[in-house]
């Protein structure tokens, strides 16, 4: 279905086409208000902290469980022998670091994955509820539930055993479920379209920031903290999350119109630039067309493959570093965060490269997405295979894994934003589907790893090699599927035929027209013919 240019004089917005990132576009006839720290920037900062807190709660168990498990008591009193294929190490393992619980690797896998069961089942429901009732309270109270139940983790582990702990982590996952869909909805209400790209990137960078903070600090608390070390991880982060939740509910408001102290010029600027999101009805979702769309399945499988590989690294890397590479708890937490620091930095760099590739007109949207995504999925796949052959060289293994996870940052300029290329109108719905499915795949990772390491008293390198090989295989296969069937072009089902009689909102274009994903050019607002 070809695109055509439409008149710049229309202001009616029945078409309801959302444009996330148009360069040199002014949504309002007035100039953007000049303030050092506008209210929308404060909202963005609070959402960044919320995302960071969410990932702290999500990842701290992977470090804590290393300190919780009494490795010398596993297998009915048989002493655990660390992987002896490498011989003596220059940093000996301190057996006094053994914890309170004799949990097998399989049980540890269930504990690590229980959080994700709760997280997965609430993705789509909260996406629907947030659209109908607003996002603020779901996000704030969800994080509050997550934080309060963090205080109960030590109590559940000591009093309720494995399944009591799994229940608490499951409830924490339920509380974290609203984070992504509600954050997305808040950004849609507060951030003008021409700012969403950088503001959205700033908010979601909180995920990597939270992981970077969680890993080393959890390691330090496990070794030097109060109440036996590992419980302090959940007490400290529980306090931080509770404080953030209360502050968020008090100081942040649902939208600019409901904010009592926002500058009137900023409120007008935001409301004028948000193209009628609250006054028009979205067209029906074209379920049949989406189900038949190969580019949609390309994103779906790429997302699922990424989550499986990423969760394998996130949940199992601290255990591998202690049991095989023999890092101490303090070193474990610090060094485990290095790959995510690399991912954070590389994702920032590669996003600039991706923007240049598209703006230079040397690469199409499709070519850019596939090339950058290949780096993001083939890179960690190859690194996992290489790391499985590095043997006892701890420095080389850590370096390879750091590079591999760092390259994984390419996915943020690959399939992660490809929803917007295919369908600006239904991108949120597509994200809820792929994110839910991807997290289902991700929760299988720690369970699979726990069963593959069949002898928990001797986690041999060969067993870990299988874990790495499977994750690498999933990365590469799903990345290849994306390269074959993926697309950066806007899909025909994003523009129903009745849009022909419904002119879209137009805005003042001050410079060159935007370039569409199919290679044609048009003003920022477009309609189909």
Swiss-Prot record:
List the residue ranges of the region (Disordered). Answer: 495-529
Q: Which residues cross the membrane?
A: 37-57, 110-130, 148-168, 202-222, 232-252, 338-358, 429-449, 466-486
**Keywords assigned by UniProt?**
Ion transport, Membrane, Sodium, Sodium transport, Symport, Transmembrane, Transmembrane helix, Transport
**GO CC aspect terms:** membrane
| Coiled-coil stretches | none
Q: What does this protein do?
A: May be an inorganic phosphate cotransporter.
NCBIfam families referenced in this protein's UniProt entry, alphabetically: 2A0114euk (TIGR00894)
User: Could you tell me what this protein is called?
Assistant: Putative inorganic phosphate cotransporter
Species name for this entry?
Drosophila melanogaster
């Amino acid at each position: 279905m070809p695109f055509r240019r439409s008149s710049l004089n229309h202001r009616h917005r029945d078409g309801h086409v959302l444009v996330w990132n148009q360069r040199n576009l002014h949504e309002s006839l007035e100039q953007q208000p000049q303030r050092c720290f506008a209210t929308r920037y404060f909202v963005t900062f609070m959402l960044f902290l919320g995302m960071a807190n969410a990932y702290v709660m999500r990842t701290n168990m992977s470090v804590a469980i290393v300190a919780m498990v009494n490795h010398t008591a596993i297998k009915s009193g048989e002493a655990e022998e660390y992987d002896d294929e490498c011989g003596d190490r220059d940093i000996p393992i301190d057996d006094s670091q053994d914890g309170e619980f004799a949990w097998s690797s399989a049980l540890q896998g269930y504990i690590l994955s229980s959080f994700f069961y709760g997280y997965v089942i609430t993705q789509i429901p909260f996406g629907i509820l947030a659209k109908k009732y607003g996002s603020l309270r779901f996000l704030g109270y969800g994080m509050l539930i997550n934080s309060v139940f963090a205080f109960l983790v030590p109590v559940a582990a000591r009093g309720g055993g494995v399944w009591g702990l799994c229940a608490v982590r499951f409830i924490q996952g339920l509380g974290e479920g609203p984070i992504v869909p509600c954050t997305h909805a808040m950004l849609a209400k507060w951030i003008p379209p021409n700012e969403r790209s950088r503001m959205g990137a700033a908010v979601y960078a909180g995920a990597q920031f939270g992981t970077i903070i969680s890993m080393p600090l959890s390691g330090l608390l496990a070794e030097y903290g109060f109440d036996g070390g590992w419980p302090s991880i959940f007490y400290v982060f529980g306090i931080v999350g509770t404080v953030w939740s209360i502050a968020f509910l008090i100081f942040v408001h649902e939208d600019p119109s409901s904010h009592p102290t926002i500058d009137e010029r900023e409120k007008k600027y935001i409301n004028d630039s948000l193209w009628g999101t609250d006054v028009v009805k979205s067209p029906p979702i074209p379920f049949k067309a989406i189900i038949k769309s190969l580019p949609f399945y390309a994103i779906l499988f790429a997302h699922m493959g990424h989550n499986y590989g990423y969760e394998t690294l996130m949940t199992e890397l601290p255990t591998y570093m202690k049991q095989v590479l023999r890092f101490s708890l303090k070193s474990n937490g610090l060094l485990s965060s290095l790959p995510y620091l690399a991912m954070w930095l590389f994702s920032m760099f590669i996003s600039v490269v991706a923007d240049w590739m598209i703006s230079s007109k040397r690469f199409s949207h499709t070519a850019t997405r596939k090339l950058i995504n290949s780096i993001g999925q083939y890179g960690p796949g190859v690194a996992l295979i290489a790391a499985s052959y590095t043997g006892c060289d701890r420095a080389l293994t850590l370096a390879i894994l750091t590079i591999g996870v760092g390259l994984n940052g390419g996915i943020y300029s690959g399939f992660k934003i490809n929803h917007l290329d295919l369908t600006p109108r239904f991108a949120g719905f597509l994200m809820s589907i792929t994110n839910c499915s991807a997290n289902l795949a991700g929760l299988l990772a720690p369970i699979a790893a726990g069963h593959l390491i069949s002898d928990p008293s001797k986690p041999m390198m060969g067993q870990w090699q299988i874990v790495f090989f499977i994750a690498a295989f999933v990365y590469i296969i799903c990345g290849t599927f994306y390269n074959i069937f993926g697309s950066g072009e806007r899909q025909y089902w994003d523009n129903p035929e009745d849009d022909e009689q419904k002119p879209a909102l137009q805005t003042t274009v001050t410079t060159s027209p935007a370039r569409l994903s199919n290679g044609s050019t048009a003003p920022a607002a477009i309609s189909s013919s």
